Amino acid sequence: YHTTILPFTRLIGGPMDYTPGIFEMDCSKMNPGNTSRVRSTLARQLALYVTMYSPLQMAADVPENYERFMDAFQFIKDVPVDWDESKYLEAEPGEYITIARRAKGTGDWYMGCTAGYNGHESDLKLDFLTPGKKYEATIYADAKDAHWETNPQAYTITTKKVTSKSRLKLKA
């Protein structure tokens, strides 16, 4: 996937124009006769709001598609567009990237993890968090049966208490 390469090419010099947030991957739903698909899942589209630094953000899909998934759309409403701090937790260009970013003017952290064709499993230390502080992580992830081609809108939302001593397992 090109989204695991862009952070090492176009994003090297600073922010870029990138518009994630597509919730309907089947292009024929809006344009009959167009059989192409967006090679992504809904949860991956959310992760791109964090992994792709683009401080002028918008929602890329039509309102009707967001109305079907309001719990996932909440992330788009909440995610900041500018950051005070960014940490590249792990990366292999063309394979995977996991980034943690601290929202501008707050202590709120956001993580995004995305992978190429082979997927990726992470076991991440959260030692960048403020020691002694407790956080509630809201995790938007692909469901077990999610696949960009057959089930791109299968996702889960879970919450978990974490601290700077916690580890977080992610699958992209």
For the regions a protein language model found, what residue spans apply to each?
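Edge strands and adjacent loops of beta-rich recognition modules
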Residues: 73-103
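Acidic/polar loop patches that form or flank catalytic/metal-binding clefts of enzymes
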Residues: 18-19, 57-70, 76, 83-87, ...
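Carbohydrate-binding surface patches
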Residues: 93-131, 135
